[in-house]
Amino acid sequence: MSNVVRIKAIPVSIGPLLFLPVTSLPALAHASERGHVLLLPTQYYALGGAAAVAFSFLVLVLLPPEPLLRFGARRLRIASPPFDGRATISFLSFLVFALLLYAGATGSRDPLANPLPLTVWTLVWVGLTLAHGLLGNLWAWLNPWYGPWRLAVRLGLPETGWLRLPDALAYRPVLLLFFAFAWFELVYPAPDDPARLAAAALAYWLFTFAGICLFGFAGWTSRMEFLSVFYRMLARLSVFEGRPTPKGFSLGLCPPGGKLVEAEPLPPSGVAFLLLALGSVSFDGFMRTFFWLGAIGVNPLEFPGRSTLMTENIFGLAVMTLTLAGAFALAVWTGERLVGGRDLKRAAGLLVWSIVPIALAYHFAHYLTALLVNGQYALAAMSDPFFRGWDLFGTAVPHVRAGVVLGAEAAWWIWNAQAAAIIGGHVLAVVLAHAIAFRLHGSARRAALGQLPITVLMVGYTVFGLWLLSTPTAG
């Protein structure tokens, strides 16, 4: 898309939602292919956000951390259903997945008319990811493997499989798989192509189901299925907490992030996994900025397409993630040096949990506009999944309208929602890092001193995130 809209009244970055005219919006099914708005400077938001994050740290330094830990440990049980329904829900999810694969292979070649790419990239990767931060580990019920696996177990498959994964693998397999997923999403030229996406999704389902049969469901999904690992980590931020019981499960409430403070330290590969999750969504925004395109010698007003930039983008994705990992490691090392700590591995494994609200905030801010627009395309595609002229739900309209988000006032709300998410995510991260640092060091003074470098990093990343939202983009 070559259109560039100039807004001179307000500082705003809203992606594909502001393409005029009002009648309909051209957009791609993949969230990363967003529209472009040239903006007025947003330095006031950046300065205000950085000040808010820094001020939250100063307030925490003045307050005793023990009440914060006690508050985070509070739990309130709200329900104890006599059954969990996991197998049934998962099997239904598998059937929906099979229908989506069929639609991808035989339906429309248009990514905006085929439900498979819209479901994968908008409803699942955007919507379901955000839901995990609010509602808990929904993937435990919605994954398309658990139901078929339970059926296979009833037919005689050993519940624990036949083999065991070496403990030394840790999170290395899912780290590689998540990087492959990020490559497919951000670098591969056609991640939205329905037929190619159907082939990739089917191959991954077969690979995962074979692993589950060989190594058992828990053994495989805890270290070899990247979505299960990623969603389980995000779910620790949720205010809902589910625990299995002999007759079903117990559902309770907890403070947001309370489960992150109590989490066990991640091994180095788990630390790298979380940092890759943040680095990939950050690069998704960075790769289309005029700054990045200029750095790799591309005129942003003559964007050549993803297929010509595969080498540069895979390099950029790796450098972004390694830079973030290096900055995090340096911050943890500096903090441990300040307090005389010696267990750098444990410190990094605990403090990295404070990154989770930042990763979720970036996910919300970066994909919000795509969710609002492409979610409408998804509703239309679901009414005619096989491109046969159906209108199952009365939503199969020829054009998706986005009048709901057009205009200066709507743009103002979108921008402020994005900025609030970035700032709020970093403030919560500072609070969690303070509680984790107290757990790590055992005294308020050592916790504040050890957390200081991490806070500096978070302040800097707040400014970077707000810059990503406001800087001109192309592609």
Over which residues does each language-model region extend?
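Transmembrane alpha-helix/helix-exit interface in multi-pass inner-membrane proteins
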Residues: 281-290, 325-334, 358-394
